[in-house]
Amino acid sequence: MYIFQRNFLYYPFGKILIIPEDFQEINLKTADQTNIYAWFRPAQKGQKTILYFHGNAGNLSGRSDRFEKFATQYGVMAISYRGYAKSEGTTSQDGFFQDADSAFEFLKSKNISSKDIILFGESIGSAVAVNLASKHDFGALVLESPFTSILSIAQKTYWFLPVSLILKDRFESDKIASKVSAPVLIFHADKDYLVPFAEGKKLYELFNSPKRFIEIDGDFHIALSGDYLMKHITEYLQEKK
């Protein structure tokens, strides 16, 4: 279990089959010299940019519909984590955090300020987004089906194992949520079959910045349409002006 635990946490299956129209394919170099694949569509004048961190399964192609919707009102950048489609390296928490840092550095190189960047994290990507948001002052932090930590979920799932002693990648958003200065918007289905609703609600309570929690009636995990997300994100940002 200790040796193979990352095989249970990360599912980087599939190839990049679809690239959204007008998106650029780019390669990033991380601090540890790992090459990371990403998509980028520059923002139009006056638009903010969404920096997107996907969940633990699949790849960017499975989110292409969302990205196309977002691109009608925002610039969009989405990275393929190390170990996932077209990226080098092996999966790990610290590696993912470095991947996110490199994406932010790329946007800065395009003269995009942190306040003009909206971080979006889904599921395990929520922890990547929270980590980055705890270190810089962003325009907003949007999370879909987030959790307090992988440890919290693992303890419920593998209650018969000493997971607190053997878990390598903990993604402990609960320990750094208070450091986030950006406004926070959270979406979570009340009967989410994978990440318990209570996890998202508990994390929400730990943020000290302006925040909103949108509870959705349903038993799904990461299934909201791009239109639905964009509507609520845009409304929330308008209120925070």
Label each region the model flagged.
Residues 1-29:
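An N-terminal hydrophobic leader/cap segment in hydrolases
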Residues 31-106, 110, 115, 122, ...:
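Membrane-embedded segments
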Residues 66, 173, 182, 196-205:
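Short alpha-helix in the alpha/beta-hydrolase fold that links the catalytic acid
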Residues 106-110, 116-159:
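Primarily recognizes the serine-hydrolase "nucleophile elbow" in alpha/beta-hydrolase
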Residues 180-181, 186-188, 192:
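Short beta-strand/loop motif that positions the catalytic acidic residue
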Residues 191-195, 221-223:
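Acidic catalytic loop of the alpha/beta-hydrolase fold
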Residues 219-229:
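Catalytic histidine-centered segment of alpha/beta-hydrolase-like enzymes
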Residues 227-241:
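Catalytic active-site module of serine/aspartate enzymes centered on a nucleophile-bearing elbow/loop
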